[in-house]
Swiss-Prot record:
Signal peptide (residue range): none
UniProt-recorded name of the protein: Large ribosomal subunit protein bL25
GO cellular component, one term: cytosolic large ribosomal subunit
Role: This is one of the proteins that binds to the 5S RNA in the ribosome where it forms part of the central protuberance.
Gene: rplY
High-level lineage: Bacteria, Bacillati, Actinomycetota, Actinomycetes, Kitasatosporales
Length: 197
């Protein structure tokens, strides 16, 4: 995982009016907290931060008054209509420190031939990983799975140094028979019974 370097400026003005002024300057108000330190209020360059946040669990290297600090996004607030960043909460991390994060579950391969549906019971997995080696996602094969099959959290291969932070027996994916096919079979069965009578 690569880190994104951002120049941060300390923020002394607070409140709705100050936040609006900051956003008008194409910057985003943010707060950095963690490790028992007092929260630090900063502003970040809006466009660079928006690009960085496209990567899930991005590691940010913040330059705050000449001091470099590592942080990961904890909460991101966006405008509901226009989608611009309103505020970001960042959690301080250290190299080598373990953190709990959610990673996306991707699938590869095809289900067995037939009309089957793949249900994503969980679209993300909570894992514990080193702050500087957080995986963007995990991938699991669904090749040849048929109706009734399920994939549990423990069945998903994780990168080295990453462990599950949820129940290992949690169902992540399951294969279902298509409803239309079942309805057609039931209708055909009912028609056969009706014709025999």
């Amino acid at each position: 995982m690569s880190e994104v370097k951002l120049a941060a400026e300390p923020r002394t003005e607070f409140g709705k009016g100050a936040a609006r002024r900051i956003r008008r300057e194409s910057k985003v108000p943010a707060v950095v907290y963690g490790h028992g330190a007092e929260p630090v209020h900063i502003t970040l360059p809006g466009h660079e931060l928006l690009l960085a946040l496209r990567t899930p669990n991005v590691l940010l290297s913040l330059d705050i008054e000449g001091k470099a600090q590592l942080a990961i996004p904890k909460a991101v607030q966006r405008d509901a209509i226009k989608g611009f960043l309103e505020h970001v909460d960042l959690l301080l991390v250290r190299s080598g420190e373990k953190v709990n994060v959610e990673v996306y579950v991707h699938t590869e391969g095809d289900l067995a031939p037939g009309a089957y549906l793949l249900e994503h019971v969980l679209s993300t997995l909570t894992v514990e990983a080193e702050a500087t080696h957080i995986p963007e996602s995990v991938t699991v094969s669904i090749e040849g799975l048929e109706a009734g099959a399920s994939i549990l959290a423990k069945d998903i291969p994780l990168p080295s140094g990453t462990t599950l932070a949820i129940d290992e027996d949690a169902v992540v994916l399951q294969v279902l028979a298509a409803q239309a096919e079942e309805a057609a079979e039931e209708a055909a069965g009912t028609a056969e019974v009706g014709s025999e009578a």
